[in-house]
Design a protein with these regions (language model features):
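Conserved phosphotransfer microenvironments
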Residues: 48-67, 80-84
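The C-terminal output helix
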Residues: 115-121
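Acidic, metal-coordinating helix/loop segments flanking the phosphotransfer/catalytic sites
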Residues: 32-48
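Short hydrophobic/Thr-rich beta-strand motif most characteristic of the beta2 strand and flanking loop
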Residues: 25-33
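Conserved active-site segment of CheY-like receiver
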Residues: 8, 79-83, 103-105
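Conserved acidic segment of CheY-like receiver
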Residues: 1-11, 16, 20, 49
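As written
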Residues: 92-98
Length: 121
């Protein structure tokens, strides 16, 4: 399965690519912006998007929810340092396709969150 990396931090992308490519059956693809993300999801929406919302060009939770409705088979792992409690509450209450993981999480938790998103249908 291809994991889409929507994170503008080079070091985070490099680290996630390294971790994911060590996991069996997974590969990564970096998407630069929302347009590229939507093109990749049109090709195959049954995928996981690891998204740093705070650094990506998605404007608000409403826009992210529209993407979730447009691509209902996509699993979203919000991977960030700074998400407001209200933002997280809105997303989690709106769809079970969203997961949240802090960038400061230990490696075992990061791997577990990725595997959870991949295995969830």
């Amino acid at each position: 399965m291809k994991i889409l990396l929507a994170d503008k931090q080079d070091i985070t992308r490099a680290g996630l690519t390294y971790v994911i490519e060590k996991m069996e059956g997974l590969e990564t693809k970096y998407v630069e912006d929302k347009t590229e993300l939507m093109l990749a999801l049109r090709e195959n929406e049954d995928t996981v998007v690891i998204l740093d919302y705070t650094l990506f060009d998605i404007n608000d939770s409403a826009e992210l929810l529209i993407l979730n409705q447009r691509f209902p088979y996509t699993r979203w792992l919000l991977f960030s340092e700074d998400l407001s409690a209200d933002f997280v509450r809105v997303l989690i209450a709106s769809s079970s396709m969203f997961s949240v993981l802090l960038k400061e999480s230990p490696l075992t938790e990061i791997k577990e969150a990725i595997r959870f998103c991949v295995d969830r249908k």
